[in-house]
UniProtKB/Swiss-Prot annotation:
Keyword field contains Lipid biosynthesis: yes
Annotated GO MF terms: acyl binding; acyl carrier activity
Example GO biological process: lipid A biosynthetic process
Keyword set, alphabetical order: Cytoplasm, Fatty acid biosynthesis, Fatty acid metabolism, Lipid biosynthesis, Lipid metabolism, Phosphopantetheine, Phosphoprotein
Family: Belongs to the acyl carrier protein (ACP) family.
PROSITE patterns: CARRIER
Gene that this polypeptide is encoded by: acpP
Modified residues annotated as O-(pantetheine 4'-phosphoryl)serine in this record: S41
Primary location: cytoplasm
Protein name as catalogued: Acyl carrier protein
Post-translational modification: 4'-phosphopantetheine is transferred from CoA to a specific serine of apo-ACP by AcpS. This modification is essential for activity because fatty acids are bound in thioester linkage to the sulfhydryl of the prosthetic group.
InterPro entries per the UniProt record, alphabetical: ACP, ACP-like_sf, Meromycolate-ACP, PP-bd_ACP
């Protein structure tokens, strides 16, 4: 099942709070993890791992480096979910 942008942001907010203590309300689509939320690289890896577990996706390290904003991760998850649905439908 594909998730909406709002669902992903809400769930990502919970993950960010668990990892960093930042309030979920601070996690909005236009926020940069490093510049706006002041999240370090170690915390970003933990957020990525929990996001992978939550959505059943794999984010390669080279892709993770390009995911700088909350919106970037939302779009990436939606893309992976769409690709997964297409692959399932092709079977």
């Amino acid at each position: 099942m594909a998730h909406t942008q709002e669902e992903i942001i809400a769930e990502l907010g919970q993950i960010v709070e668990e990892v960093t203590g930042i309030e979920p309300s601070e996690v909005t689509v236009d926020k940069s993890f490093v510049d706006d939320l002041d999240i370090d690289s170690l915390s970003m890896v933990e957020i990525a791992v929990q996001t992978e577990d939550k959505y059943g996706v794999k984010v390669p390290d080279e892709d993770l480096a390009g995911l700088r904003t909350v919106g970037d991760i939302v779009a990436y998850i939606q893309k992976l979910e769409a690709e997964g649905a297409e692959a399932k439908n092709a079977e």
